[in-house]
Amino acid sequence: MKDKLFKNLLHSAEGYAIFNSGGQLTKGYKPDTVLKCGEDYIIMECDTGTSRKGYLGSMLKAARYLTKEKKGILILVIKEKPNTTVKQIAEHLREYLAWLKPLTNLRIVYLIETTKYCPDKIPLKLLSSEFEKCAIKIKAEILK
């Protein structure tokens, strides 16, 4: 999905309002879309690339932003390729999210395939039961 198209979609979540759409959130950080409810954030990135480093970078930037009073989740909307599936990226990010736990208020990362998030050009309501069914959810849990 093209960047501009993604940013112009009507992303929604119960109780949240669009806070930022492609603008600079903080120095050097321009996520595709951010929804906000008080100090609770939903940060969204849509990526068509295949670089696992890119997804890790998105997660690190969200983790760095979500500190002090700010808390929230990250949603990665991914166009799958044979060498880059949602499941593969989730497994790759899982241990890094656990490692980041003491440093951030980023607690959950959702990964969802583009066509599942936006069937018929209408995005799913974020965090809805349908969204939860279609996405892979990784939590910041300490590995033992």
Predicted regions and their residues:
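Structural motif
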Residues: 40-42, 73
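Conserved catalytic cores of phosphodiester-cleaving nucleases, focusing on short active-site segments
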Residues: 33-35, 42-48, 62
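Non-catalytic C-terminal interaction segments of nucleic acid-processing enzymes
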Residues: 25, 68, 94-144
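Short strand-coil-strand connectors
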Residues: 27, 36-38
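Short loop/turn segments at strand-loop or loop-helix junctions that form parts
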Residues: 38, 47, 76-81, 111-116
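Acidic-basic catalytic patches of nuclease active cores, encompassing PD-(D/E)XK
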Residues: 1-25
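Catalytic cores of nucleic-acid endonucleases
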Residues: 48-99
